[in-house]
């Protein structure tokens, strides 16, 4: 949620608002957002079309807005570009693949096992590699005939960041929104100035971007990947699954009567 009145908000950059709040993280006296009901301003919600289920809307909204802002708002992808989507079966990665294809890009996705690699292809990726293999970045080079990629969609962090930077074409763009394997990474700075590399940060997005995601979901162009639907009583199970990497896509929780 943003303040909606500062210069950043009124210019359409509410994601940069200095007073923005993340529901369940900075709002209220307790940490966490697991609750049956939430009370927030109307301006901070978007209407769900009749043909989009509550489960699908829950699964696609935050990750979809984040992915749209990364690829369209920040990296400004164009038809014909080659886009590398790291972690293609993660919540944000699954939507990233579909947005890049929606924009006419050639998509290379990464995943950590055969099942997840197959799912990336099902989501629309043109190529997929296993980022748990030591030479994964060499396979990306082979796919691109040593030309590299135009855009890297990054949220893995330390374990792959340096290789991702090395895979960019001259003038290429890496846009990052997370660091699940660690925040401190060492890179060869020569890739930045000799290749004119763009390193961009990104977080969340705008209401207009969320509405774009919901619109394309209603048209069937973006299909949420739901790994599990769990009741609140199984919340701990969901956290264990995420920690162990035993999930593809999103975990959706359903409220229960007390």
Model segments located where?
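C-terminal capping/lid region of NAD(P)-dependent oxidoreductase domains
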Residues: 83, 146, 221-228, 237-258
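Glycine-rich phosphate/adenylate-binding loop and adjacent beta-alpha elements
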Residues: 1-45
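Periplasmic-binding protein-like
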Residues: 149-155
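Short amphipathic alpha-helix with an adjacent loop that forms part of the alpha/beta core around
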Residues: 135-146
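Glycine-rich phosphate-binding loop and adjacent beta-alpha segment
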Residues: 103, 111-114, 120, 155-225, ...
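Phosphate-coordination loops involved in phosphoryl transfer and adenosine-cofactor binding
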Residues: 79-81, 149, 171
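Mid-domain Rossmann-like dinucleotide-binding core that forms the NAD(H)/NADP(H) cofactor-binding site
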Residues: 52-134
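Glycine-rich helix-loop-beta junction characteristic of Rossmann-like nucleotide cofactor-binding loops
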Residues: 73-78, 144-145, 166
